[in-house]
From Swiss-Prot:
Transmembrane segments: 8-28, 33-53, 62-82, 87-107
Topology in the lipid bilayer: Multi-pass membrane protein
Gene Ontology cellular component annotations, sorted alphabetically: plasma membrane
Protein name as it appears in the record: UPF0060 membrane protein Francci3_2786
Locations listed in the record: Cell membrane
Length: 110
């Protein structure tokens, strides 16, 4: 159950951080206005709390692993929301990052 919970928290973290950054981007770069920016800031703040719910006690480990989730999640967000089409190098890089996440978070430690 610990791994499943951890993975779900990574997904929630990705949605809150990437979604928040996207909302700020839309508000500023796409001139959608301050409401979008404010919503984005709220989502980004929520992301900060989600990370604290991870079962591992080490901040550095969690944030390092989340970096890999962020890479893959950002590409997925781009596909789903902005019509981005990743090339094979994007996909290979994301796969390498996710492998790193698995090693950092779920390798058996002695």
């Amino acid at each position: 159950m610990g791994v499943v919970r951890s993975l779900l928290l990574f997904v929630v973290a990705a949605v809150t951080e990437i979604g928040g950054a996207w909302l700020v981007w839309q508000g500023v770069r796409e001139h959608r206005g301050p409401v979008w920016v404010g919503l984005g800031i709220g989502f980004l703040a929520a992301y900060g709390f989600v990370a604290t719910l991870q079962p591992d006690a080490h901040f550095g480990r969690i944030l390092a692993a989340y970096g890999g989730v962020f890479v893959a999640g950002s590409l997925l967000w781009g596909v789903a929301v902005d019509g981005f089409r990743p090339d094979r190098y994007d996909l290979a890089g994301a796969a390498i990052c996710l492998l790193g996440v698995a090693v950092i978070m779920y390798a058996r430690r002695v």
